[in-house]
Structure formats: C-alpha cells, structure tokens
Regions:
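Juxtamembrane transmembrane-helix termini in multi-pass membrane transport proteins
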Residues: 2-65, 127-143
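Small-residue-enriched transmembrane helix starts and helix-helix packing motifs
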Residues: 1-16, 38, 42, 91, ...
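Selective transmembrane alpha-helices of multi-pass membrane proteins
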Residues: 66-95, 149-160, 171-200
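C-terminal ends of transmembrane helices
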Residues: 22-32, 89-95, 162-169
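Hydrophobic alpha-helical transmembrane segments in multi-pass integral membrane proteins
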Residues: 54-56, 114-126, 187-200
Length: 200
C-alpha cells in the first residue's frame, strides 16, 4: 500500500509539468489561453492520481468476486484484453482524433484500445467529460470518451480478476504466508508500474 501512495505522489509530481506542457503545446492552448491550459494540465495530473486510488480499491474487491465466479467470461475477456492492449500500445495517445478528421467509429475503437492500455475508469471518464467540454472539442472527443468508458468496464472486470485467479494457487496449498507473500509481490509490482506509467 505504501508503494501505491508513493507511486501516486511521484506520478502527480512528474505529471503536472508533463501534462501542462502538453496542453500548452496543443491546439487547445489557442482557444483556452495559457492560464487555463496550465490549470487543465494540473487537473489532468490530479485526476490520474485520484483515479489510481479508486482503481486499486474497486479492482481489489471486484477481483475477489471474479475469483469466486470462475466464469468462462473471464477467459474470453482476457483474450480480448491482450489483443486490444497490444493494439492500444501501438496506436498510443496520438491516435486521439481531436480535430474531427476521422470517423466516429474509428474514434470509438481508439477510445477502447487506448482506454484499456491506460487503466481508464469511470472517475477519469467523468473528469475528461468536463475537460473535453472546456476544450471545446466536438463529437470526435466524445466518441473517444465513450470508447474509454467501455474500456473502463472491461479493465475492472478482467485484469485484477485474472491476477487474483493466478494468486489463488497459493491458497490451494493452504499456506497463508505464501498467499500473503504473493499479494505483497503483486502490490509491489503494481506500485512500481504506477510510478513508471506516470513517469513515461
């Protein structure tokens, strides 16, 4: 848990100048002005930090539920997750069509792929809805938003559920110490991932 907090703080500190600079270089800086762009950039970093906290809490409990369910849906979604995650990483954030040059369907699919690769959830979606509204973006931005919402549902139902299913093997040998060790290792890995994710 300590690494989650460290990752959140570190990511926010790194993310504020990064997101602010990115926002100031974007076309929205012309519409919003430098002052408002700086505020939006800081808000984006804080939203990501807040999202991380909520993610860990929600995914922990839903992951335990998925572990008990043991449904075939988990395996189907995991396969879909791998495919969309790879595509999302390849396409990266630059695929966001904020100037209406593409179709709504392309934007929708981009939102799904990038959203899954970035652990999008409903809390970030709510913030980004306000962000897109402030930035004056048109329907393409909301199409990305809709795709990101779908991705958020997928990520909640799948990723942590699969992790807990893997770590359930430690419980089968009835070793509480081994199970706790596995959970701690998972938390450390996720904490490191948070730091790296926000630093890149």
């Amino acid at each position: 848990m300590e690494l989650f907090i460290i990752g959140m703080i570190t990511g926010t500190i790194i993310g504020i100048p990064r997101d602010t600079y990115s926002e100031m270089l974007s076309q929205n800086c012309v519409k919003n002005g430098i002052g408002q762009s700086v505020i939006i950039g800081i808000g984006m970093s804080l939203a990501v930090a807040f999202m991380t906290i909520i993610d860990m809490i929600v995914l922990f409990f839903l992951g335990k539920y998925m572990l008990k369910a043991r449904s075939f849906f988990t395996y189907i979604m995991s396969a879909l997750l791998i495919v969309t995650n790879v595509i999302g990483i390849i396409k990266s954030d630059n695929s966001y069509d904020t100037d209406n040059t593409g179709t709504s369907f392309v934007n929708f699919m981009t939102g799904i792929m990038v959203g899954i690769s970035e652990f999008t959830n409903i809390f970030l979606i709510l913030f980004m809805y306000v962000y897109f509204d402030i930035a004056g973006l048109e329907f393409s931005g909301y199409a990305v938003l809709l795709g990101g919402t779908v991705a958020g549902v997928f990520i909640i139902c799948v990723i942590i559920g699969i992790l807990f299913k893997i770590f359930d093997n430690f419980r089968k040998i009835k070793s509480t110490r081994g199970y706790n060790l596995a959970v701690n290792i998972m938390m450390i890995c996720v904490g490191i991932f948070i730091i790296l994710k926000e630093a890149v």
